[in-house]
């Protein structure tokens, strides 16, 4: 997402505030200020000259980079109501999660969520289930353990699937053919392919009724809620939101597999020792994953 206009003032102010804060933190460390050691390393490298280092390149990746660099972007800006949010856990700020929950509660027909690292909070689980009971269709897309660069996180996140999907068996949801909750896991390959061609999906965006969207760095996991400073933009524009929704359906879901209640039981009862170890160990570390 590319933005311009008054919202940039908030983004720049946030960057400058963060930069000033971390400079202050570094300077407060005295001899443990990492800048001292970076400068010493640079000075040593300057004296010894450039060090020849061997490296391996992947020509396929190089070609992709060249193609992207040569691609001309035809940017068509659209006016949109827009607001920029930042979460700073050290101040117990939860603005982005509030924006997600409020947008889900306000949705009338459809909620589409793509999120790289998904370990749901209780508030999120209950809000999604309440939306389904109002005949809203909710589709959540996240990584599978096979595609996640942090597979343990996906394994822990799977523990929440059953609690979410079971709402589909409630009479209020079953009476709404177009409603209910779906969970999809990114496979990194198209539905008609056998070979994985893509790695971790790193997207973090959501679309509500193809009218309001959230795009940013916020993951639905404990780390984003409790540790990391995250940012996101919330905007209202039907054309732009519809473009995101089309990308979600036509591209992202085509690289993914829908999870069933039977799958969730298999996840819980897995006899794979390595899988179970990762799960139990991950649960111990869930608050910082």
Predicted regions, residues:
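Charged, low-complexity intrinsically disordered terminal segments
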Residues: 1-289
